[in-house]
Each structure stands twice: as structure tokens, then as C-alpha cells.
Amino acid sequence: MSNLKLSNNNNGNQKESSSFFQKVMKSPSTQNLLNSFSSNNSNNNLSNSGSNEVKDTTTNSPSQLPPNYTPPPPPHQIRNSSSIEGGEFSLLNNENSDNNNNNNNNNNNNNNNNNNNNNNNNNNNEQLARTESSVSIISSSSSGSNSGQPNLQRHSSNISTDDSNTTTETYSMSPNQTLNSNIDSSEQQHQDLSSSVNNNNNNNNNNNNNNNNNNNNNNNNNNNNNTHESRKLTRKIAQFISSPKLLQSSISQLPSTPTQQNVEIQTTNGGSSETSPNGLISPRPSNDQPLKEKKKKKFLKTPEIFKHHHHHKESSLSSSTTTPSTTSSLTSSPSSSSLAISSPNTTAATTTNKKSHKKTKSTFDINTEISVPYNVIHKMHVDFDLKWTGHNDFILDEKLGDGAYGSVYKGTHKDLGFTLAIKVIEMKESESVSLQNEINILKNCKSPNIVSYFGSLQTESHIWILLDFCALGSIRDIIESTEKTLNEAQISFVVKNTLKGLIYLHSQNIIHRDVKAANVLLSEGCDVKIADFGVSEKLNGALDQSKEMIGTPLWMAPEVILKKNYDYKADIWSLGITIIEMADGLPPHIDLPPMRAMKMVPNWPPPTFAEPKKWSPLLNDFLARCLVKDPEKRASPIDLLCHPFLKKDRGPDVLSDLVNQLFKIKKKKIDDLKKQQKHQTSQSSSSSSPQSPNATVNGGDIGSDGLSTSIISPIPSSPSDELDNCNNSLKLATSSKGMLSFKGNYTTCRDFQEEEEDSKHLNNNQDEQDDEQDDEDDDDENEDDEDVDPFSTTIFHGKKKGSGNGNGGVTSDQDDEEEDEEEDDEEEEEEEEDDDEINEDEEISATGTMVVRKKKNKSTKKSNKKKNKKNNLSTIGKSGSGNNLLHVAPNKPLPITPPFSISMTNEFKQLETKLFTYIDSSNQKIVNDIKNEIKQLESSIINKININLQQQLSPILLALEEIKQNQHTTSQPKQMQSKLSATNLNEKKLSSSPPSSNSPLTNSVNSSLTTTTTTTTSPVLSRQSSFRSSGSISSSNSSFRPNSAIMSAVNNSSTTTTTNSNSSSSNGGGSGVDISPTMTGRASPSIMKRFTTSSSSSPLSSSSDGFAFNSNSNSSSSDLKRHVITPEELNNSNLVKNKVKMFEDDNSSGSGSNSPSLSTNSSSTNSNNSVTNIKK
């Protein structure tokens, strides 16, 4: 501890004296003064009377001081007796302190001993206020000084007082401990601390005493300097002092004191100066400046927000006033020191000033341009980690919802009145890491699209996180309360701002992992902000990835569900699902159980809108870019921000319709709440007892946002608060259905779970006899366990200590230990039975977080659930009776059921129908594909078979053609023979009719006949050859039939003829032809000769046969029958005659010079023969 000695001389004119800061303004520059002091080893002068106030020395000449006067050095040690008066420490000076000082200085200067002894006798009964560092202020105006400026000095010696009114005592210090007096009080405090390090040059006291006289002589010479330059200097000093580095260093070097003390400094001129909470001295103007005081009263008016009744009592005891114009009081922080200095003229006033309790409003000199907080009462403190003090200053108005790890409330500050969103989280060892992670993320995020973090409050059992209060709630709340979805313009505005927030988070290597409409909030100005960082993760770098399976099931990306490495692009998938939620009102696959739908997301195609045609192609394309299964192909947030869908600049006016509807709905609900409150208060006033003062009712008080509810009560922050709240039977009021309600774990969902458990228990009792049915029931139970709230955030892991058991209650330590032991035994048994099968059992904690654990035995489940039910009933009973020691979280209403929610059986039927339709459609496609493939195979096979057959049949066809050609070649000579035979027959007939003669005439006639017959037969042969050629061609193409089919029709009419031609040529003898036809069965008529001459070239016709068939290329067996002459036709003589005529006509036309008589004779003879043969 260092001491202070102040010396003051009251002899002199008050006109020549000036205040401390008026003399500071006369200095040319601070740097010159420091250089002059360091070069001349000058020292500051201390002046003090027996009072506790600083006064200006008024000595006019150095003759008042002894010529060889040197002050004694301060003693090394002194013990001070302290007494507590009025809440502050006032230190009394020891009577023997100055005697010790004088005895130590007798060896140096005997002349000064007498003066010191006289002064010590006068100062036996005076008081001295001590600070942690001693300050000396000299405002001497005497002439003859070298520096001409007042000095401020601090040292670590004891403090002695001097009460003489006639003489002036000055104590000099070492030059390294001096500071320039033109630095104001705040700069003095900082630089005095730095000078306290150098305390080794105490041997220069005599030189400094000699220089002090010269310093006093120059004071009056510099009083008339230019004030304009001094004002410039003070401005520079103010800028130097106001730097934050200077204040931090000065505060860090100050020693701490356990008390809160006041500082009062007075001058003889009526002006006063005060100290700041850190001991820095600031000036006060004198009574000569009343106008300046009036101008600055409004600026220095004490704000009412810092008033508190506890601090008010303490400050009333410690504050003291002498006169309103000369004194001031300051209540500083607990670390600030105090200094009370008064003059002998005001000692009587200091003893009686405790009676008057009037706080004087402080002002400051306009020339200094320094503003320091005055009359400040410490209400709460925020350190560099943003940890607050003052838990009871906040009031929780209503519960806004449940986050990933805690419940969110609306809170207001009692004194300041500002509103915040307070997230109340129960302190658990298992969740400490996640809590610290969330706080670190919020602390480092500073973006207009991210919820701001204002600090945290911590108790033994809970921690409060102070966040932005978004009055309009989340997008999910707006959709539920208004029962309307967003249009394209509104979706683009929300998505664009959400993307900006995600881009900022990803630039900080943060993955949100829970992007959904319930976590996108709207402030009063429709600013979009991302909230709830309970499951977020900060990666180590841009290339780092995460593997943890966490998030809300229906919003999770496929790579997160498959537990693959994923990065910030998982948030883009969640943003796409959020777009569907804003457009359709609900996320996709909401009709299915959330866990089952989550498992099917990687297998199903990416989801789309319920009605894609309802939305523009740009929005559909934007959604398709977000919902790409492959994260590498998925678009980045920067690419999506440049998408044409988001190019239009849309402001918050787009949401005006929804906001207006929201406020109308909330006004109606608030009016209903008021009516209910009035009705309840009227009933409770007649029956219930008066409430405790801690509980407040805000039934008619609607906050600035118009969203506050009726009854409020703070969460107990300490054991004392819990005792205060013991008599409170009030609970936190909750918002009504759809009003500012976050989707999460709703406590009323426990009833639904209990009903399921009861039904399962009954089923198990009925099926105990059949083991197979028990296994089926177990499978059904596992499926039913997956039916959880699809809007709750899910964390998948093996174990989590301290988590809830599905009912929001907290189990005791013994229960936790028992559960851990049972879980260990169960795990060992399961591993022995089947290591691959892991049955998951979902549980929901009080904060809305769904925890996935390994399956427990049924007995342990039932016992834990029964315990939880008992705990819930006990807590409800206590809260109703008014003896609730712990705060009970309010119940949330049931979530709005979706319009198409149906029973489980209908869901299974729908699944079956969907599966069947899907299978049918897929089967139809497969069948059509198979048919097409079969047709192609058939065509290809047929083509191959045709090619092979053609290749194999080609030699057969060639052989047939060769056979036909051979037949043709063989048939030609036979036909020639037959024709020759026919001609011979004709010749014989002709020759038979006249007598044969050997005359040359007859020979010539015969020769002529032969020539004519040859000539006539030649064209016939040519025709027959052409017919044969055409017949061969047609036979190759037509189907070949066997000869038996044709010959069977002619078996009865077949004939055989034998011709014996005996030609003899002798001397002038003629040739004769003998025809002896031999008939088998039936005689061939002579009409058949016609057919022999015009027979076709078919291989069936031959000259040897008795019949000649007219068979063309397209003839058939019916044609053959048609041309065969039947006996009935032969019987008809007329028909025979006509045919004979036709035959004769043909022969006459065919043979040019043949005589008709011959032909008729021959034909008649032939016909007669045939008729006779037929008759036979």
C-alpha cells in the first residue's frame, strides 16, 4: 500500500489561482513537459491540509518558504487503523506517523525538523482516506517556477497531512515517479501505475526540493498563455486517454479491493473533481459555469434502468454531500478504490452530510470533451465469454417450443424491459460437450441470417442461452396457424435468405444438419434467421467430413441415413425437403412411419411436389437440383443462389399477407385468453388464497410484440429461488394450438405411447402359450416403436447417459446405474445369440430429441415406464398442491394431425395396393419387352431356317430340272414317232379306199401326201415343243403330284395299241401300213386321235398310251376328268357328229391341200369302229 501526502497553502489571491484543468490547458504540449521533467529531475509538489479535499496553493512568492527547506522522506512502513462507516472504508492516520517521518529526516536538515514537529502537533486528530496508490496534486500559482505547470505525482510511501494555513510544505519525489500535470485524471491513473515500478531513485530528494521553488516561481508567468492552444492539447489528451488499449491496461494493473468505495475531491475555488470506477479522476466545473451545468444535465442524467433497491440502500449509506455545487458522489464497481479528501473549512459539513441523502447530478467541463459514467449502480455483468450475472432479473413469459436439447421460452428483463428468447437446458454430463459446441457455434456466428447470441446464464442444474426473439415465430408455426401454404414469391424470399445463412455457416466450416421450416424463424421485420444449432457440427477444415447419423428423419439426406461421409451438401437436401414443406404444407412421405420412410429414402426416387404442374418450371428445376441423391452431383449453395428462380429481388413485403393473417388470428386468441383469465381470476379470488409476491400475472399486459401470455413464473436458478417458489402454484402458460409452437416432443404424446404399451401388454398375455405368435408380436412391437413424431430431431447412437426415458422426467442416479447394469447384461446376451441383429428402440427425451438405443428386455421397459408414470403423477400432484420444489415444464398441445392420417390397417392396405400397382406396372413393361424379344427371335429363326432350306433344297430342284429336261429330250422322238404313225395311218386310209397300183401316178400321189403331211406336222411339232417348254417351267413351280392320282381316273378307259408298220419298197411297188389296235377293257374311239395330235408336253402323256390328256400348267384332276370322254357322251350320236365335224374342220384348217373326202371317210370309219368297240 502506498500513501498520499497533500500540501496546500491558503495564503494568496484566489484570482491568481486556477483549477487543475485550467492550468492543464496552458501547457504547450504533453511531450515537451515530459521531456522537461525528465531532464531537470523535477518533482511534483504535494499540498494537503488536515482535511480530505485537494486545494490550490495561493503563495505569491518563494519568500514564504525557508531557503534551505527540504521535506523529510516518507517512512518505510506505517500501520493504519480502519473503521467502517456508512458502508465504506475510511482510514485514520496514525498519530506517530509524521513523528517517524521527522525523526528520519533530522540527520539531513535540522531547520526543517522544527517545522515538521509543529505541523505534526497540529495534525494529531486529523483523518486521512487511503487509496491503494497515493496521489499528490499541486495547483500552485506562485511565480518563479521553472515548469509553470501543476504536477500530479504518485508514490508508494505513507501519507502525512499538514494543517498549517501560513506555511507551505512540499514533498518532492523521484523524477521517474513524476507525471505531467496537464494529463487529466484518467490519464494520471494509468501513468501513475506505470511509474510505480521505478521506485529506486530516492537519493535525489535534495535536488528536487531546490527545483520545486523554481517551479513555483514560473506558475504565474504562464497563467496568461493562449487558451486556444491549451484546448487543442486537451483534445489530443482526450483522444489518447479514450483509447481502449489504455483503459484495458490500466484496469488490469489496478489492485483489487473487496469493498465498494466513494471518492470526493474538493478545491478551494468551489470546483470539484471526481473519480471514475477505476480510480480515474475527472474534473467538475465551479459555480462560475451554471449555464454549462444546465446544458449537460440531460446528458448526465442517471438512467433509471440501472436503479435497484439493494444497491440503492448501500449507496445511500456510503454517499455524502457537503454542498450541491462543490461535492459529488460516485458509486463505482467493486474493484474500484475510494478517496475522501476534505478541507478544514468543510470538516463540520462532512460530519453532518450523512443525514442528507440527495444524489447530486454530476456534470463535466465542456473543454475536456471526456464523458465518464457517473452515479452508476452495477446491475449485471457480462464477461468476455458472454456469461451474465443476475439470474433473477429475467422473467419467462411463455414457452415457445422445444429445440434439439432444451425448451425455448420468451423472456423479458425486469429493469431494462428488452425481450429475448431464452433456451433453458438441463445440465447433464452427457450433454455438456454438445452444449459447449452449440454455445461456441453461436458465439462465433455473426450474420443477419443467423440467430444472434447474447450470452448465457448458468446455475447448478440449468443453463440459459440468451438468443434473438423472433416475434413472428417459425415458418412451420405460420403454416399451422394460418392453415395456408406459401406461394412461389414467398418461397423464393425465404429460400434466398436461408441460402445466405447456409453460405455463411459453410464458410465457417459449420454443418447445420437440421434445416427445416421449424428452424427458419421470422423477426418482427420479417428477417429470415436460422436457429437451433443443437445438432450442428463444426468441421476441422473445408475438406473434412462427418459420419454421425443425426437430424430429423424425413429431412435427412441419403448419405446421412447410410452413414457415409458427408459434408455441407447434406443441408442442401434438407433445404429441398423444406421447400416441399412450404409448398405442400407437409414434408414428403408423412403418411408413413418416419423411421420406415427414412430407411426407404435411399432406395426411392427423389421426392417432388404433390402437384408439380401447379408450380413453375424454374421452381421444379430448382427443387430437382437440391434433391439429387449423389452429393457430388448435387448443386452447391452458391450455384443455387445464382439460379434464375432466385434472381428477382423480393423484399419482406411478400410476406405481408401471411403476417396480417397471423396477427388477426393471434389477436382473437389473445382476446379469448383475456376472457378466460378474467373468468379464472373471478373464480379464484373467491376460493383461493392470495398469491406470493414472486409470481406475477400479466393478464392484461400485452408486450410490445403482442404475443405474451397470461401467467409467468421464473425457473428456479438457485436453492433460495426454489424456496421462494415453494408457495407458487402457478405454472408457465403455453401458447395455444398452432401459435408459436415449435414442432418437437410433445408431452401429451406419452398418453399415446402408454396406450400402445397397454395394448402390447395385453397381446403378450394372450399369446404366452404360443412361442411362434410371441415372435410375431415382438416384430410388431419393433415396428410400432418406430412410430414417433416426424417433426422431432433424432440422434442415433448406441448409448446416451442421463437421457430421458420418453416422458421428459429425470431419473435418479440409482435408476441410471441399474439401467446401465441391465443394459450391459442384455448386450452380452444379444452378442452371444446373434451379433448381426441389432434391435433399435427409440426413446424421446424432454427436449424433443429422439434417442436410439439398443433394445431392452420387456421387464426392464415396463418397470422403467411404471416408475416414470409414478414420477409424473407425483410431480403433477405437487404442482397442483402448491408444494412443487422443482419447476415442471408446461404441457404442449397435440400437433395438428395431417388431413390424410389414417389407421395402421389402412396404411398397410395402401402400402399393399401401392406395391401391387408398382409390381403390375413393372410386370407389364417386362411382358411387353419379352414379347418384343420373342418376335425378334422368331423372325430371326425363320430367316435362318429359310436360308438353310433353300441351301438344302437347291440341289434337289436342280436334279428335278435335269430330270425334266431328260424327259423332254426322250419324249421328243416318241412324239415324232407317234406323229409319223398318225400320218402313216392317214396315208393308209387314203390308200385303202382306192385300189393300190404300182403306177407312177400313185407313187407321186403318195409322195405328195407324205410331203404334205410332213409339212403340216412340222408346225405342229414346233408348237408341241413350245408347249413342253412352258409345261416344264410350270411344273417346276407347281406342286408335283404322283401319276397314280391321275391314272386312277383313267384305269377303266385305258387302251393299248400296237402298230405294225411294214413298209416294203420294191420296183415300182407302194408302201402299205397295217394298223391292228389291241384294246384292253374298252375300245378307244377314233376321236382320241385328236388328243394324240394335240397332246401336251406333260410327262404323263406318252405316244404309246391309248389316251392323250390335255394337261396344261395349271390343270388338275378335275380338268382331266372333264376332258375324258365318257360312254354317255359316246352314246349321243349328235354330239359325236359335232365333234367329228370340229375335228374335220381342224384337220382341214391344219392341212392345207388334204382333201375333205379323205378325212371324212377316215373319220367316219374310225368313229364307226369306236362305236362298235364300245358296244361290244
Swiss-Prot record:
What GO cellular component is one of the record's annotations?
Answer: cytoplasm
Q: Which residue intervals define the domain Protein kinase in the entry?
A: 394-646
Entry EC no(s): 2.7.11.1
User: Where is the CRIB domain positioned along the sequence?
Assistant: 370-383
Compositional bias, Basic residues, is annotated for 852-870
Q: Which residues form a coiled coil?
A: 92-133, 812-873
Its top-level enzyme class, in one word, is transferase
Q: What keyword terms does UniProt attach to this protein?
A: ATP-binding, Coiled coil, Kinase, Magnesium, Metal-binding, Nucleotide-binding, Serine/threonine-protein kinase, Transferase
Which reaction(s) does the protein catalyse, per the Swiss-Prot or TrEMBL entry? Answer: L-seryl-[protein] + ATP = O-phospho-L-seryl-[protein] + ADP + H(+); L-threonyl-[protein] + ATP = O-phospho-L-threonyl-[protein] + ADP + H(+)
> Per UniProt, where does ATP bind?
L400, G401, D402, G403, A404, Y405, G406, S407, V408, K423
Compositional bias per record (Low complexity), positions renumbered to this chain: 1-19, 32-52, 93-125, 133-148, 156-172, 198-226, 316-353, 682-693, 710-720, 991-1044, 1051-1066, 1148-1176
What does this protein need as cofactor?
Answer: Mg(2+)
Acidic residues composition-biased segments: 767-789, 813-844
- Which terms in the Gene Ontology molecular function aspect does this entry carry? ATP binding; metal ion binding; protein serine kinase activity; protein serine/threonine kinase activity
Protein origin, superkingdom: Eukaryota
Q: Where is the composition biased (Polar residues)?
A: 173-197, 254-289, 873-884, 968-985
Q: Region (Disordered) spans which residues? A: 1-231, 254-361, 670-723, 753-885, 968-1083, 1112-1176
UniProt lists compositionally biased (Pro residues) regions at 64-76
* InterPro entries assigned to the protein according to its UniProt record, in alphabetical order: Kinase-like_dom_sf, Prot_kinase_dom, Protein_kinase_ATP_BS, Ser/Thr_kinase_AS, STE20/SPS1-PAK
Q: Note the Pfam families from the entry.
A: Pkinase
What GO biological process terms are annotated to this protein in UniProt?
A: intracellular signal transduction; protein phosphorylation
Give the positions the UniProt entry annotates as the active site.
D514 (proton acceptor)
What the record says about family reads: Belongs to the protein kinase superfamily. STE Ser/Thr protein kinase family. STE20 subfamily.
Q: Which PANTHER family match?
A: SERINE_THREONINE-PROTEIN KINASE PAKE-RELATED (PTHR48012:SF28), STERILE20-LIKE KINASE, ISOFORM B-RELATED (PTHR48012)
Q: State the name under which the record lists this protein.
A: Serine/threonine-protein kinase pakF
Provenance organism: Dictyostelium discoideum
Gene symbol of the encoding locus: pakF
